[in-house]
Amino acid sequence: MSILPIVTAPDERLKQKSHRVLEVTDQTRKFMDDMLKTMYHEDAAGLAAVQVGILKRILVIDIKDHDPVERPKDFYPLFIVNPDIIDKSEELVTANEGCISVPRQRVEVARPESIKIKYLDYHNKQQELEANDWLARVIQHEYDHLEGKLMIDYLSSLKRDVVLRKLKKLKNNIV
């Protein structure tokens, strides 16, 4: 397994919508394994394929150490391919989020408290998952990446521009 390079804002790839995967193959699984290793290396809760430069609708998530819900031992890591949010609660919960593609920034984001998704798993099997609390937030954050949306897109344009200027300076090692 390889550690993949992280794409950071303002890279334009992060603003593009990712493409559906036709089938989960051995090659797809190897890529997901590399994504997982990269996510652990970055100490992240989740990772979308676009964050490593691949515009495919693939997510990996592992929050087992922070999930308040008791789950089966083999529940994590989650490999989520072609996710579709098929239901979401009307109740919104606001929380502070960070993102490895938006380094050194934290943003308050309001998201539905619970969601239901359908997706393909690691073995190309159709699955449905109801998630709430922290897992719902992580899935929605990563799902936004697949749609070309970053957490800073929830900010006002003025605040977003300030963050983007900071990120450009950081990228150019001016900070």
Swiss-Prot record:
Reactions mediated catalytically: N-terminal N-formyl-L-methionyl-[peptide] + H2O = N-terminal L-methionyl-[peptide] + formate
Top-level EC class: hydrolase
Entry GO MF terms: metal ion binding; peptide deformylase activity
Cofactor note (record): Binds 1 Fe(2+) ion.
The protein's required cofactors: Fe(2+)
Active site positions: E142
Entry EC number(s): 3.5.1.88
Family of the protein in this entry: Belongs to the polypeptide deformylase family.
PANTHER family linked: PEPTIDE DEFORMYLASE
Protein name: Peptide deformylase
Organism: Rickettsia canadensis (strain McKiel)
